């Protein structure tokens, strides 16, 4: 028989940097989960990732206080900031441009994010990436 799911917990944790300090410790602790077990398992699975890459993780919590977790791809804004070589997006996205990304970079980001996006073609994924880029104040060039 399958275990009874009592809840889900969504966190964004830097790759290889999960530790019991806030926000991870309190979030897991108040649900009665083993914090160190999660930290060790997460850090082991994110060894290949670049250090401090934000990794969204969905933790499934079961009635017997056990858990499983699923890692997603880093946020689109992270990839866009890397591609445009900027620290943050524009403060006024409609007026000020923070940087530029090319169509080739947009396609590359769309291919990386494809499994987490709610679309079935690379073209629709590219439109999502372009929309995110525009909302960050990035110009999508040729």
Curated annotation (Swiss-Prot):
GO molecular function: large ribosomal subunit rRNA binding; structural constituent of ribosome
Signal peptide (UniProt feature, chain positions): none
Record's keyword annotation contains RNA-binding: yes
Any GO CC annotation of this UniProt entry: cytosolic large ribosomal subunit
Annotated GO biological process: translation
PTM per Swiss-Prot/TrEMBL: One or more lysine residues are methylated.
Entry keyword set: Methylation, Ribonucleoprotein, Ribosomal protein, RNA-binding, rRNA-binding
Transmembrane segments: none
Family (UniProt): Belongs to the universal ribosomal protein uL11 family.
Function: Forms part of the ribosomal stalk which helps the ribosome interact with GTP-bound translation factors.
Subunit description: Part of the ribosomal stalk of the 50S ribosomal subunit. Interacts with L10 and the large rRNA to form the base of the stalk. L10 forms an elongated spine to which L12 dimers bind in a sequential fashion forming a multimeric L10(L12)X complex.
Name of the featured protein: Large ribosomal subunit protein uL11
Organism for this UniProt entry: Bradyrhizobium sp. (strain ORS 278)
Organismal lineage: Bacteria, Pseudomonadati, Pseudomonadota, Alphaproteobacteria, Hyphomicrobiales
Gene that encodes the chain: rplK
